[in-house]
UniProtKB/Swiss-Prot annotation:
Protein name in the entry: ATP-dependent Clp protease proteolytic subunit
Enzyme Commission no: 3.4.21.92
Lineage top rank: taxon: Bacteria
InterPro entries cross-referenced by the UniProt entry: ClpP, ClpP/crotonase-like_dom_sf, ClpP/TepA, ClpP_His_AS, ClpP_Ser_AS
Gene behind this protein: clpP
């Protein structure tokens, strides 16, 4: 998994009954039901996340999945494939932002299982309306403008559902880039708790 922008990925060597076995660090963490979204949300990264979620559901449908997010956002359609899968599978998906969860990343953060959405103390969350630009004939521009408005309304509905804010508040607060500290994100309902130590995570 080339998550780290072509940087070398650390390997973990484990002793087994048949000798040593090497895993890249992300594959090893996947064994612990940890999934990462690092960087832009696009079709490639979304397909990786969806595949891992489905695999972990098949492995154990009754055990939580831990989804770590450090993302500036990206493609709405790619992000919605992750969102729909999170809602579709049986295991609870616990979400945590480390670094940033912006745009589609913030939607995925908020979409975690109720009571299991976390932020690290210095992480940042940003919500806004979807961005779009299109050139072409007037009729095509109109079609794309209506699609952007539809997507905006759908994302606002999702944020309202998971945050507990009313739709009017969400619509107003996403009119421009809206950056939040971990504390503000908790107040707003995008996360349930701020973690400083692992021991503070309830079982």
């Amino acid at each position: 998994m080339d998550i780290m922008n072509n940087l070398p990925i650390p390997m973990v060597v484990e002793q087994t009954g048949r000798g040593e076995r090497a895993f890249d660090i992300y594959s090893r963490l996947l064994k612990e039901r940890v999934v990462f979204l690092v960087g832009e949300v696009n079709d490639a990264s979304a397909n990786l996340v969806v595949a891992q979620l489905l695999f972990l559901e098949a492995e154990n449908p009754d055990q939580d999945i831990h989804f770590y997010i450090n993302s500036p956002g990206g493609s709405v359609t790619a992000g919605m494939s992750i969102y729909d899968t999170m809602q579709f599978i049986k295991p609870d998906v616990s979400t945590m932002v480390l670094g940033q969860a912006a745009s589609m990343g913030a939607v995925l953060l908020a979409a975690g299982a109720a009571g299991k959405r976390y932020a690290l103390p210095n992480s940042r969350v940003m919500i806004h309306q979807p961005l779009g630009g299109f050139r072409g004939q007037a009729s095509d521009i109109d079609i794309h403008a209506r699609e952007i408005l539809f997507i905006r309304e759908r994302l606002n509905q999702i944020l309202a559902k998971h945050s507990g804010q009313d739709l009017e508040t969400i619509s107003r607060d996403t009119e421009r880039d809206n950056f939040m500290s971990a504390e503000r994100a908790q107040e707003y309902g995008l996360v349930d708790a701020i973690l400083t130590h692992r021991e503070s995570v309830s079982a």
